[in-house]
Amino acid sequence: MGLRGTMAAVQSPAIAVAGHVVRNPAHAIMEYLEQHGGTVSHYDFHAATFSEISGDLIRATRSPWMGSRISAKEAAWFIDRGTTAPWAAIPLDAQLKQADPLAVDGLYDRASVLWEHFWDARPANVSTAKISKVLYLMRPGLFPILDSYLTKFYRTAARAAAIDVGSKRASLAMFRTLHWEAIRRDILGSETGLQVLRQVLATTGAPLAEQAARRLSDLRLLDMLAWAASPGEADQNDIGIRPT
């Protein structure tokens, strides 16, 4: 059965994303897959298949799929910078929900080191969105795709997370926003809902939905639900912020 034919029938329990409630996540994901199936097939399903940043990886981030607008010069920088990145410190299947910022020298800290390997040396016009779209393909359960839309959508929650974490870990008190932690808290708070969502998608009879249920991370499903919670076009200008 096709995606459109199953949309009206699917139902799963509500999930909150950055304080916004998606009342029928299964329908929202089916709608996303209907509208952006090419992105899922040509970008998401290539995640975790690369051992290094390559030309093929960069091409997957560009239009018509993710619209990263990474130039040839920037692509060369990503590829070169990737050769010295600390990939070995982070398992391929690392999950954001395990990246507790209060755990010193834990997954959060290792992910931050990997992020900063690119962030601290970035050339002009390479900022949060471009880096996150590349790192997502290398570690899809860990790095959110922080384009300008998702950054704005999570801003209030990220500020609250920063205040809370900063009060408990002095080394992180300097940050005004912690987007990773805000998203991580939503994943932890929605584990049951996400599990049911996967079960529903897996029984739709729609091949793309069934593959999505098996292959997409909780992080990416939540990203898709963010669009359903507050639909609209993102500002196309990448924002230069540190998202961790």
Language-model segments: residues:
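Hydrophobic, aromatic-enriched interface-forming segments
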Residues: 132-138
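An N-terminal alpha-helical hairpin/helix-loop-helix interaction module that forms a charged
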Residues: 1-122, 140-244
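Short linear interaction motifs
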Residues: 111, 131-132
